[in-house]
Each structure stands twice: as structure tokens, then as C-alpha cells.
Amino acid sequence: ILLDVTTGTGAFMKTVDQSIELAKLMVSIGTHHGRRVAAMITDMDTPLGHNIGNSLEVMESMDVLKGHGPADLTEVCLQLAANMLVLADKGTPAECRAMAEAAIADGSAFAKCKEMFAAQGGDTRVLDDYSLFEQPAASFELLAEQDGYIVANDAEKIGSASVLLGAGRQKKGDPLDFAAGITLHKKRGDYVKKGESLATFYGAADKFEAAAAEYRSGLGYGPEKPEEAPLVYALVTKDGVARY
């Protein structure tokens, strides 16, 4: 069992140390019950990839398996896959990383996903033709209000904005809009000019104003490019914590 324990503004645990303590507890519980368990501590200050929303994230996940997904999301997926293979005694960390990379390169990772999708009654055509997904009612471009580097792109606020668009529930029983969500064009560390598109919102037009305000509340600009944050902070196993 490999756990992905996120840390940061968009995570349940906001600091790396808190996330490590949670991971250690979960690993110890699994180990106590005879399971082979590890946990990766991954960053969630800024969203991985470019898409937030149900259908949007499925499309982006398929892009990763096809070998042309966003670099940050692909890297985390490769590290997760490699560590899962290590847990299964398939080789050394380097060998398992190479196996994961090869599965994407030769198409076997995507083929296996399609097989699993079909086994659960899914229409595999949508995995190749994204136009078959339900389409959003409307779209809206969120524009930069000034020039500068994006120094904050709060994952929690972006997640809340996507919920306001209908991609998630504000309360039990709320309907989901599977086509709703956000595509990020600029993320933390990117330079933007005033009037440039930061993100595209998808959903019902009457929800854009509130979602835009929520998104902007977690956005920060600065004159200097911020230091790049790690994608993975640590690996927690029964033998201890390896910090990266």
C-alpha cells in the first residue's frame, strides 16, 4: 500500500512535519496489520498539473499515461509508481523508476488503464476522444490585474473556486457538474502581464463572479521569481523517514 500524503495550503495537513507525523501513524497501523506500507509526502501549495475538475482531471491523467502530461504531475506519478513497484519487490528504486518510465513510453500504462476502465463498464472511446465528455455550459477567462511573477497560487482557494463552479459539493446532496472546473494557464513562478489569461473557468455563467473572487483571494504577485518548491518532500516507511 502506497499512500500519497499531501502537504500545504490545499492539504489536510498544512506543514511538512504535520504530514510526516500523519504518514508515520498510517504506516505504523498498516505495518501492525501485516501490510507493506509506505507514504510519500507531496506538495499541495499549488495544484499539480493544469486542471481542476472531474472530467478535466481525467483528461489530464490520460495525457500523463500517453506521455504528454504536465511535467510536475508526470514526475509525481512516476515517483508514486516507482515506490509502489519497490514495495512489491520488483527491483531497486532506480530500476523501478525505469520500469515506470518504460510503461508510459511503450504505451502499456495507457493500455492497462483502458483495460481497467472497460472492466468497470466505462466507454473507452472517451479516453481517446475528449470531445465525448460532457461539455461545459459556458467558459470565462480570468485575467491578470497587473504585471509580475506569480508568487502565490493557493491550492485551497483554487479548490474552493472549483467547488463554487460546481466541480465539488458545498454540502451533502449537492449535484455535481462533471464538466465544471478550472484550467490554469499560469502558475506559481510564471511571469504574467496585465490582461493576460491566468485561467479558464468552466461551468454555469452565473457562478463565475464568486469563483473568480475566491481564486483571486489566493493569488499573489511579486517582482522576483519565487524559489521553486519541491514536488516531493519525504518518503515514510516502517524503517523511518527519508527527506528529499
Model-derived features: positions:
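Well-ordered secondary-structure scaffolds
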Residues: 1-244
